């Protein structure tokens, strides 16, 4: 497969993901179900290892994992981050996405859920912003890859987050 064919396949795959997410948004009125559906789509279509949506608790600066893949219920319960705390909290604070090519080498990565085992994994985290307020974050783990591939994934996740902000 040529590089051009690979890029075309990736574009088709991403378009399919966006279409499926939009269909679920049109049908789903429960936020938790919608977030779980989106994670299912991402797991099926792009093969994420681990992923989590953390939403801001009402009237607080704490973000709590609302939906996750690749984590046990206990690991998910441990996923609570204050604004500015760790990478997820910094994304919530700044409203800017974060890309960590290798979490084992980043001292800011808290591994609060304790769901990672020290393998060479990239961590991508994007803010979910509605009316200029960060209402949540979406993070994924994926095998480490060249920086340009990770940056492309981060941009795609940002697009997914922007679309979801309207449904959350």
Give the location of each predicted region.
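Short beta-strand-to-loop transition segments that serve as allosteric relay/switch motifs
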Residues: 71, 137-148
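A short, aliphatic-rich beta-strand micro-motif
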Residues: 121-129
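Signal-transducing coupling segments at domain and membrane junctions
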Residues: 73-74, 101-122
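Allosteric cytosolic regulatory segments
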Residues: 154, 158-165
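Acidic/proline- and glycine-rich, intrinsically disordered low-complexity segments
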Residues: 74-98
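Signal-transmission linkers at sensory-effector interfaces
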Residues: 1-33, 44, 135, 167
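Sensor-regulatory modules in signal-transduction proteins
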Residues: 128-131, 145
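GAF sensory/regulatory domain recognition
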Residues: 40-43, 50-79, 104-105
């Amino acid at each position: 497969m040529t590089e051009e064919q690979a890029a075309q396949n990736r574009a088709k795959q991403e378009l399919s993901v966006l279409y499926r997410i939009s269909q679920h948004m049109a049908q789903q009125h429960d936020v938790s179900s919608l977030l779980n559906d989106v994670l299912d789509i991402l797991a099926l279509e792009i093969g994420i290892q681990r992923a989590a949506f953390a939403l801001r608790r009402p009237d607080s600066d704490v973000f709590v994992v609302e939906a996750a893949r690749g984590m046990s219920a206990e690991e998910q319960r441990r996923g609570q981050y204050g604004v500015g705390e760790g990478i997820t909290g910094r994304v919530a604070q700044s409203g800017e996405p974060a890309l960590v090519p290798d979490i084992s080498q980043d001292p800011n990565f808290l591994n609060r859920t304790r769901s990672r085992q020290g393998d060479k994994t990239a961590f991508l985290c994007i803010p979910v912003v509605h009316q200029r307020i960060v209402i949540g974050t979406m993070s994924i783990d994926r095998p480490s890859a060249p920086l340009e591939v990770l940056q492309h994934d981060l941009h795609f996740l940002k697009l997914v987050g922007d679309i979801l902000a309207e449904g959350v």
